[in-house]
């Protein structure tokens, strides 16, 4: 059987860039607050790149539908140094923030049904409903249990190289 969503990314393929969004005044204020109150937490506000308004979020969704959804299915699991997102939408955080509902994204997808490959349509719907919403349901219903349970009985803490991206495992460090 042919494989439709596990293709290796060709070297010559051009991966569309995700548009940079101009920061809002509120984003600037919040970044300063985070920098002064959460200095010991992992992460860096200088690398923040997500839209924080409905208008900008819609631009991202439209851009995904025009530039990346067609090849999403083929390269859904591809790993490369060329891009952090490859042909993914990067919309999940925007759903988490309430800028979209999963239903809105599915409705947009239905409008391009028949115009994009089935593996992209099915693959993306599976990502939104089959994985993202399933995991959301797990967290909503079992959050306290998951926080307290140590199913594998792990004892060691994560080393700082996991947070700093210098594990020696190239795909992990690049992520």
Predicted regions and their residues:
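Active-site-proximal binding-pocket segments
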Residues: 90-91, 95, 99-175
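Active-site "lid/cap" and pocket-lining segments within catalytic core domains
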Residues: 1-108, 115-118
